[in-house]
Amino acid sequence: MPARAQNPISVVTGGTGFLGSHLTDRLLAEGHCVIAIDNLITGNTANIGHLAGDANYRFIEHNVSDFIFLPEEKIDYVFHFASPASPIDYLELPIPTLKVGALGTHNALGLAKAKTAAFILASTSEVYGDPLVHPQKEDYWGNVNPIGPRGVYDEAKRFAEAMTMAYHRYHRIDTKIVRIFNTYGPRMRLRDGRVVPAFIGQALSGQPLSVFGDGSQTRSFCYVSDLIDGIFKLAMSDFHEPVNLGNPREMTIKQFADEIIRLTGTRATTEFKPLPVDDPKVRQPDISRAKEILDWEPRVRFEEGIKKTIEYFRESLAAPR
């Protein structure tokens, strides 16, 4: 990687995933050289295909739950985004999910320590579990079932946060923690089990939209470019406590299904199914801290972002297989 001396070097674990690939694009646009690391168990090289031949980009296929060695003498930022993140993935891969939250975080922090790099952890709103406080602020400790099927992801991220703060306090590593709420946009996998691709895929395929429970549970949806902007601002800041990033505009799942049907222009219907175990009833970020510390808030309107996402999936479904 023939970087000029003044170019920051960033490592992105999970670099071929939905968020990791968008983050990579932003870092490159900001003049960073990027080393992306991914074992491809849930990532997709199609997300980084446009970077082929970019002299400031390098991809390494590697499982970060194993020791990470990089020959670069100096690295400026380590973004730890590696982890199965959709219910389908972490229910199918419970032990790898726990390992990347524990061993993967430990290895990524070790890399940051060895290279004197800032460390940015991709955490999640799932650390709040099925919250009893609404909306959720960063000082809420959560309501998590540690032995439930979702617990592998929730507790992996809670442990990762604890490990990150331990490295910050004990080793004086420059660390940041971003708690990511529901995010959507191009490069999501059509069949990853999350509600945005699920509803859009079903609507475009003429299938009923699967609404779990009675549809009264709520979510807040943030477009990916807004999220990445917040992550970049946090990485460049000197703030070390967790920060919520998400869109506080809240809607019920039934309302969301109706919006998808309207915006896809289809005649799809909804079909109600049993609610999964430990599925959160409400989810809405309090972003007061992000506004104050980062001067950040989401800017992409819901309809604008969803239309872009629908078009992405429409093209994906039409592409030859």
Language model feature labels by segment:
Residues 1-183, 203, 225, 231, ...:
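N-terminal Rossmann-like NAD(P)+-binding domain of SDR-like oxidoreductases, especially those catalyzing
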Residues 134-135, 190-198:
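A glycine/serine/threonine-rich, flexible loop-to-helix segment
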Residues 4, 9-10, 23, 29, ...:
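C-terminal substrate-binding subdomain of Rossmann-fold SDR/epimerase-dehydratase oxidoreductases
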Residues 83, 98, 188-192, 220:
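Nucleotide-sugar-dependent glycosyltransferase donor-binding/catalytic pocket residues
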Residues 42, 186, 247:
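Short, conserved catalytic or interaction motifs in soluble domains
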Residues 186-189, 280:
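A generic structural signal for short coil/turn motifs at secondary-structure boundaries
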Residues 53, 148, 188-192, 249, ...:
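Residue-level signature of the cytosolic catalytic core of signaling kinases
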